Amino acid sequence: MKIYFASDAHLGARFHKDPLAIEKKLVRWLDSIKEDASAIWFLGDLFDYWYEYKYVVPKGHVRFLGKLAELADRGIEIHIFIGNHDIWMFDYLPKEIGAIIHRDTLTVDLLGKRFFLGHGDEVDFRSKAFRLIRAIFRNKFCQWLYAGIHPRWTFGFALGWSLNSRKSGLEKQEAKKYQGEDAK
């Protein structure tokens, strides 16, 4: 049996030209590994935005979620690390399919090898702004306040923020490239 890893699918992201095609590609990959997989570890940002309200989960991702359920029903362990885009994943996936949610980095022995696992934002804390936002997002009171806002508003806001953040990051990368800062 094998253990598989995947990260940063950003399902539902507005920067994907065809979000459904990305989801279908991920489902095809899961289909291709289901015969020999004993566990699948998703290392964060499965979704571009995920917030679980008490009785509401995000629209979409049906093929992917159905495939996860199928794999879990086959006895394949599903591990999901929280990323900075799906930080508000709570108990829906553990209750529905038995997924194991990891909120922090983890050192684990798998098949006789030691791994340090987590999402990248859990490893690199250089940005003070990111640390502040992360603390706000993880604060129970702030989560409670946010949950009081209708999903119609929060989802549009979050997906727009994500898209703008990505564009800003790409612009900074291009500026560094232009200035030669990425030269080896």
Give the location of each predicted region.
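Core catalytic region of metal-dependent phosphoesterases/phosphodiesterases
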Residues: 2, 6, 11-110
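Generic hydrophobic, helix-prone segments enriched in Leu/Val/Ile
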Residues: 50, 183-184
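Active-site-proximal loop/helix segment associated with metal-binding centers of metalloenzymes
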Residues: 120-183
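Short hydrophobic-aromatic micro-motifs
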Residues: 5, 114-118, 125
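Surface-exposed beta-strand edges and their flanking turn/coil or helix-capping segments
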Residues: 18-20, 93, 114-116, 129-133, ...
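Short, charged/polar low-complexity linear motifs in solvent-exposed/disordered segments
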Residues: 31, 67-68, 113, 133-135, ...
